Amino acid sequence: MNLLVHINAICLVLFLSSNTYAQNQIVADLSQENVKISTDFQGAKILLFGAYDGQEGDDIIVIVTGPKGLVTVQKKEKVLGVWVNTRKVNYINAPKYLSISSNKKIEDILNKKTQKISEIGLNNLKIRMQPGIKVENEKEWRQALTRNMLKSNLWSINENSVSLNKDALFRSFLILPSNVITGQFEVKILHYRNSKLISQQINSINVSKSGISAEIYDIAQNYSTLYGVFAVFLAVLVGWGSNLIFRKV
């Protein structure tokens, strides 16, 4: 608690004395800007804190977006009594991580039209299917994408999780799960007043691998053929060794 008090006090002093105060009316910082993923990585909890030139009733929304890329959704059907993947759809620009936090319900901050224009909300993301793919019930595929990402903790909506203090200070905890991918993450802090954007700031978090996991990842990316051959060889070796042990037993 004392640490948070000191952080808030320092943040407020920096805010009131900086040029950013006059320009953006909001300043923010992170307790950790670099996250290292090792073999025993269990996730990360990062404190976002800052100050803003606020009034009673102002709102803060924090959006953390990870690298965008290919995300595959597969459809399973029962064939001869066995569940198998029968169809798949690729989304080519889906965020691999997305967290939206706010000081209260988003619907109480922004109307549906503004949410859609600003891409705030999981259903408002402008995500495209891979060109050439034609499917029926596109809405169901999109719902499946959202459901899968929520289930894997890679997407989340965290309303009422941003704490505001005296219309001047704010803080929130950002949670990165253990299965988070590497790359540059954008942290966007939005300050609203009567549903209108007053100010904003963008910070970043860098997530990278370290130790032996980084070396394995580099080999897999840069020497994919060699890595594949080694993986097959290792699997054969383990199988042969297990068979030999059980044969002796």
What function would you assign to each model-found segment?
Residues Q23-F41:
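N-terminal edge beta-strand
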Residues N8-S17:
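Bacterial N-terminal signal peptides
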Residues L47-D53, F173-I175:
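Short edge beta-strand/loop segments characteristic of extracellular beta-sandwich folds
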Residues N179-K209:
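Extended, hydrophilic extramembrane loops/domains of integral membrane proteins
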Residues T225, A235-V249:
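Juxtamembrane interface at the cytosolic side of transmembrane helices
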Residues K78, V84-P177:
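Membrane-proximal low-complexity regions enriched in glycine and acidic/polar residues
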Residues I175, I198-G228:
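Short, aromatic-rich amphipathic segments at membrane interfaces
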Residues A51, V64-V89:
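Membrane-embedded segments
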